[in-house]
Amino acid sequence: MSSAGDWRASLDALPVPVYTTDADGAVTYWNRACVEFAGREPELGQDRWCVTWQLYTTSGEPLPHSECPMAEAIRTRSEVRDKVAIAVRPDGSRRAFTPYPTPLFGKDGAFVGAVNLLIDVSEEQAEALAEQASRCRRLRQATTDPQAAQILDEMAKGYAENAAALRQSRPVFKAA
């Protein structure tokens, strides 16, 4: 593949979300699978680091786009691996995913941007959250401390709700 058009056609044909950014993190390209995954069309040159509407950690904390794995890869100019995040679409549905942000360098070795591939891991994440809820319920049954019991009940409820929310969103892509 010798031209940018060849590369673009190849990325467009992929059934998984892929997008690129420039060296400052502005989104410069995305394939159709990205739009389906994110539930929105990114704004060229406006969106930075991510194609998603909102992000959360797996523990339910908001994850600012400026702190997402792609932003980290751009800041450090190195691959970021072994992360999972939760994408929230404009319709409120959620997808858990593993990103694979990878820096891009020109022929002269200068950093030019990054590419990111997103793998939907919602079902696996929902199973892990359901197991955490079950673990909290078992611990709750074993404790005699009322305060600990209340905390464990709340934790179990949160894990179960997050698992249910991931399962209610129809998967777009399955991990290989």
Where are these regions (language model features)?
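PAS/PAS-like sensory domains across diverse signaling proteins
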Residues: 24-26, 36
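PAS/PAC sensory module
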Residues: 82-86, 93-99, 115
